Amino acid sequence: MPLFNMHQIRGQLGRDQRLLGLDPGQKTIGLALSDVSLMLASPYGALRRGKLSVVAAEIRRIAAREGVGGLVSGLPLSMDGSFGPAAQAARDWMISLSEQVGLPAAMWDERLSSSAVNRMLIQDADMTRQRRAELVDKLAASYMLQGALDATAE
């Protein structure tokens, strides 16, 4: 299944369907869920990153339970905006995941999403390192998905 842009994904969603945002890290995948009006992204949880088939099965379960009609994954562009090896690996992973889950997918620039979330948790929430580690993945997914929703709002 090819990747789509955010406008195409929004156009493919059925009535009352949501988007599931993914922030894939080395150890975990942060998850965020949009509301059905596609205006608000909320942190949803995190999955342990492992075999693609296991991750895909869990995302299929979440999608069925939550009425998800599309996936949006973070795209780790280089700081200068170029498409480097990390972005290519993320793109390849997302195409494979989309095919296994059976949902259309888009990617969205995630540069500095984890940094922004960490900074907020340190400065504004005054959280410990351990508590930040528990939250950062799903909050980064929410931050990324909210950016995608805001940029493509109609």
UniProtKB/Swiss-Prot annotation:
GO terms for molecular function: nuclease activity. It is found in: Cytoplasm. InterPro entries: RNaseH-like_sf (IPR012337), YqgF (IPR005227), YqgF/RNaseH-like_dom (IPR006641), YqgF/RNaseH-like_dom_sf (IPR037027). SUPFAM superfamilies: Ribonuclease H-like (SSF53098). Gene3D superfamilies: YqgF/RNase H-like domain (3.30.420.140). Keywords: Cytoplasm, Hydrolase, Nuclease, Ribosome biogenesis. GO terms for biological process: rRNA 5'-end processing. Its EC number is 3.1.-.-. The keyword Thylakoid does not apply. GO terms for cellular component: cytosol. CDD domains: YqgF (cd16964). Belongs to the YqgF nuclease family. Could be a nuclease involved in processing of the 5'-end of pre-16S rRNA. PANTHER family: POLYNUCLEOTIDYL TRANSFERASE, RIBONUCLEASE H-LIKE SUPERFAMILY PROTEIN. This is Putative pre-16S rRNA nuclease. It comes from Gluconacetobacter diazotrophicus (strain ATCC 49037 / DSM 5601 / CCUG 37298 / CIP 103539 / LMG 7603 / PAl5).
